[in-house]
């Protein structure tokens, strides 16, 4: 029985490269001269520390442009609230999403059921497995999911006949 898996994974090496490029650009930009702003990557979270809201927004813009250049979807990032830190600084934490949460998995399965195709979706940990009788239905399910905006970046892997 043909099947495929739907996953939401981000290459952490590319995230590291994008953060390093952003740090380099921040160090070279004129509007950040004398600033104590910093960007650090900790496991699956990016911590931004900036002097004020203006610089925080500028750093987030730099990070987004670097992520897009490195082929990482902006949907893979979850932005925390900007909060004040010690010394009058502003802090924001950006989480890199790995895997599909249970709620998003339920949304994906609901979208698949709404297509009225002869395919079934089942949630397995941080991925969704879709099985069906024929390959064309599975490809139609992929097309439908690509057309929907579920708020996360989806990849389709392990297509088996």
UniProtKB/Swiss-Prot annotation:
Function of the protein: Nucleotide-binding protein.
Protein name, per record: Nucleotide-binding protein Gmet_3206
UniProt KW Nucleotide-binding keyword: yes
Homology family: Belongs to the YajQ family.
The organism's place on the tree of life at top rank: Bacteria
GO molecular function, one term: nucleotide binding
One term under GO cellular component: cytosol
UniProt keyword list: Nucleotide-binding
Keyword Nucleotide-binding: yes
Classification via InterPro entries: DUF520 (IPR007551), UPF0234-like_C (IPR035571), UPF0234_N (IPR035570), YajQ-like_sf (IPR036183)
């Amino acid at each position: 029985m043909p099947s495929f898996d739907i996953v939401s994974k981000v290459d952490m090496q590319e995230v590291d490269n994008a953060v390093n490029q952003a740090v380099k650009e921040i160090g070279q930009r004129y509007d950040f001269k004398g600033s104590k702003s910093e960007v650090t990557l900790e496991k699956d979270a990016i911590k931004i520390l900036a002097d004020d809201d203006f610089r925080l927004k500028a750093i987030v813009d730099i990070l987004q442009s670097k992520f897009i250049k490195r082929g990482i979807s902006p949907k893979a990032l979850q932005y925390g609230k900007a909060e004040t830190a010690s010394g009058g600084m502003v802090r924001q934490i950006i989480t890199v999403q790995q895997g599909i949460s249970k709620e998003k998995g339920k949304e994906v399965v609901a979208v698949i059921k709404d297509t009225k195709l002869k395919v079934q979706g089942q949630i397995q940990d941080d991925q969704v497995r879709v099985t069906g009788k024929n390959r064309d239905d599975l490809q139609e399910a992929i097309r439908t999911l690509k057309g929907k905006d579920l708020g996360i970046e989806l990849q389709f892997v392990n297509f088996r006949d």
